[in-house]
Amino acid sequence: MDEASESRRDHPWVMRTYSGHSTAQASNELYRSNLGKGQTGLSIAFDLPTQTGYDPDHSLASGEVGKVGVPVYHLGQMNTLLNEIPVGQMNTSMTINATAAWLLGLYIANAEDQGVDPTQLRGTTQNDIVKEYLSRGTHVFPPEASKRLIVDMIAYCSEHVPLWNPINICSYHLQEAGATPVQEIAYSLANAIDVLDAVRDSGQVPEERFPAVVGSISFFVNSGIRFVEEVCKMRAFTQ
């Protein structure tokens, strides 16, 4: 094992609790409390109106605001959410898909308000809108337009936020929706390959930066009760 691999193996995992309260203020208090107790990163849960692009006063958002996560609709709320949290030192996961570009834009703007250069930001946006058509359903735009959003965001991060993971390919949700372990990995890898092909074909990323784009993709993989099959799946997936 080379020195770089040894260093990566010994690097501690980021410890972060997936959470979001009914308001940005309440969520901020929770995050600062958890960080004070040893948590090393943030994992932000957004409410459904935020996930699907509705303002809190929209009729379709009635009864859903702040219910399963924090509502964030403008920069002021993002500033409140991250108040007194040094985002330049954080590794932040945002579980957000259809509106990922919007939320990342707010996160970057908040960082700039804190005097942090976007090139220093580390974290992940799920941004796997394709899987929303296969499982969860929080898509907003048609499939091709959704994929264009994914591609544009990956290209933007490659140039301006290079330490960020702009997409988290999700196989987890596919198994929850009924896929077998084999189908789960097959469909998610097909999704990842299609996205990377679209990024390459868009012409937005120079050839010399494309390997870094491939390396910036992360994966969210399920592990069900079929023990032997799941072990084989994980071994095959990592080859």
Question: Language-model segments: which ranges?
Answer:
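Catalytic alpha/beta active-site cores
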Residues: 1-230
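Glycine-rich ThDP/TPP pyrophosphate-binding loop and its adjacent helix/strand module
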Residues: 195, 235-238
